[in-house]
Amino acid sequence: MSRLCLPASLSEEEVEALDRIVRRSRPLHKGDYLFRADDPMRQVFVLRSGALKSYLLDANGDEQVTGFVLPGEMLGLDAIGETRFCGYAVALETSLACAMDLEQLEDLSGRIPGLRHQLLHILSRGIHGEHEHIRRSRERAEQRLASFLLGLSMRYRQRGLSPDRFTLPMTRGEIGNYLDLTVETVSRLFTRYIQAGLIECHGREVRLLDRSGLCRMGGLEEHQEASTSRR
């Protein structure tokens, strides 16, 4: 299980040590919470299958989507140093996560350099993704959505899945919330991309037809796609 939950160059002995602290959580159905704000911060999680949405609530109780979690991705590390989670993680579809006790993981990472390096890499990538998201919030709407689709494509590729044909687990409203766009704007942009021959859509299934065109739309060179890949 640890090979999926926390990819790292570990020896067989180290993998076995990690496996001993990994446990599979109960299956989550659409709408079930993996954790909520103010839940005790005792574990970190890695999604094994399905998809999750992370979000915060503002002062008015309105939802602000902060990211989408795909299989093989970790969540909860950003709350390290806190005693409670500050946000929510909810299943967008039937999902399964594995959990690791935080104290045991910290102890193990102190004894396994490769594991410690991987955890630091995940934290660094998350911070970079947040900065990139803030930077892109100032861009035009068509750039934001193009970058979002390319980022999803890269994340699917990194997990050995098709980067050119995938199903969106989130609604267009949730995409709009994340990108700070109205659902009408998101729908209009999808129509524009389809008419331009950039993508093809059947329900929530998306097929990327012209990656170079999407990169131009997003203001990216093709080799820059990786910078859009973090949630």
Regions inferred by a protein language model and the residue ranges of each:
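Cyclic nucleotide-binding regulatory module and flanking cytosolic helices
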Residues: 1-30, 74-75, 79-82
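Cyclic nucleotide-binding regulatory domains
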Residues: 6, 32-94
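Short aromatic/basic micro-patch
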Residues: 9, 25, 68, 99, ...
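Alpha-helix/helix-capping structural signal
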Residues: 49, 103-104, 173, 212
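Cyclic-nucleotide recognition modules
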Residues: 67-128
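Polybasic "coupling" helices that flank or enter modular domains
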Residues: 110-182
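Phosphate-/nucleic-acid-contacting segments
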Residues: 154-231
